[in-house]
Regions:
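Acidic/aromatic-lined carbohydrate-recognition and catalytic surfaces
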Residues: 1-159, 167, 178-212
């Protein structure tokens, strides 16, 4: 994590790690995986509120870019879900962009009896929206709302997020919780073929951008 090692005298927590890396680790490692450094509402950074910003406590984009000039940097793309307290969800409720149709809702006919997931909270949250009753999908927590990849705009948004990270020096990516990306009624909703097609697309984009 960007704030795992820091010096309280420094303004940005990530600088403390970078100093520690230079003194203790650089002769042994040339790749660093920074877990989510975005503004987040829960789950140690995995409930992202804004994919285009860095948590102001952790640092700035320039901290990542400068570190990446001499080291390989790996970052997470938190692709399956987004924060219930972020701009996207606020816009979703208002039918405004960015956020309109970004989150997955299902109706009462959806068969979720076979769903496999690593949590035991209530999966679906009833919501009255757009003059009808729908159910928000929440694989990991009530604060982490699953995104709707049946909306091409969501996929395009994450391609842009990847490109933004590349522009700041990131060369290796981890697609967080990617196995849960696609949902179909009556299935386990994990590792579905549609998910693998999206992974192939990201692999193709990585090859084009010369990143991993």
């Amino acid at each position: 994590y960007g704030d795992s090692v820091f010096n309280s005298k420094q303004k940005y927590q990530i600088k403390g790690f970078q100093n520690f890396y230079q003194k203790k680790l650089k002769n042994y490692f040339n790749t660093v995986h920074f877990l989510p450094f975005y503004p987040s509402s829960s789950d140690s950074g995995f409930a992202v509120k804004d994919h285009y910003k860095i948590d102001s406590r952790i640092g700035k984009w320039s901290n990542i870019s400068n570190f990446a000039k001499k080291n390989d940097v790996m970052a997470d793309i938190v692709i399956n879900h987004s924060s219930a307290r972020g701009l996207w969800f606020r816009n979703f409720l208002r039918e405004k962009k960015p956020g309109k149709n970004y989150f997955l809702t299902v109706n009462s006919k959806f068969n979720a009896s076979k769903v496999v997931r690593p949590r035991d909270h209530e999966l679906l949250k009833k919501i009255n929206i757009f003059k009808k009753t729908e159910y928000l999908w929440r694989t990991f927590s009530p604060d982490q709302l699953d995104l709707n990849f049946k909306n091409p705009a969501v996929l395009l948004r994450f391609i842009k997020i990847m490109i933004n990270l590349v522009n700041h020096g990131v060369t290796i990516f981890r697609l967080d919780a990617i196995a849960y990306l696609w949902k179909e009624s009556g299935t386990k909703c994990i590792n579905l073929k549609q998910t693998h097609e999206i992974i192939k697309l990201f692999r193709l984009i990585c090859s084009f951008l010369n990143v991993k």
